[in-house]
Amino acid sequence: MSTDARRIRRRGQCLLIAFMLTMGGCGGSAPKATFETSPALSDADLKGLYPGTLLRQVVFEDIDGAGLLLISRSEQTSPAREDKEPLDQITLRAELFRRSDLAAPWTSRWIQEDPIQCEGLDLEAGYFLDQVMATDLDNDGRAELTLASHSFCGGGVDPQQLRIGLRQGEQYYEVRGESLVEVEGDEPFGGDRQDDPALASAAPALRAHVDKVWEAIKRGQPGPP
């Protein structure tokens, strides 16, 4: 074999090795970050993990491991004292659990509690359960968790208080506002929306998602919580 042929062959081998190292070795391309939702857990698996009434569970897997989001609701009434009316309270609670493998116990990572109190008026509060979800909108392998809720303390036709929370890892975005009230024969009222300033710098996919959730809930909850 000539000297030039040896040089060409050696150069080709070097390029092949460099390509294999770039692609993660002989096994091909490096594994991509994955996200997927999982089937619901049994009541026995969830025993002792939440207070009150369980409304929804979201089970998923992402680059941080197995995740379990539990949504619950509890009610209590403080008795009337002297000249004060009884005080009703509904507490909305979301809690994220993680575990390293199937044999490990679930460990709480964060809790978000929203106690709503109402004295002498009608109290209503709950989640928009079809807007409670885990997603991977920006395809980075880390789940975004969406919570959307409503509350009302009043005695007439008034707007509900609306809240959207979007959490991804340590980052949290929030939108608050009022439901749009439409009564036949009258001008609509309510419908105000206030965005967390940090939302403006979020990824476009996340901002679009929040807008979509707001459109879905902006008229409030028509029935029981």
Predicted regions and their residues:
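Surface-exposed loop and turn segments in beta-propeller and other repeat-based domains
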Residues: 108-124, 184-192
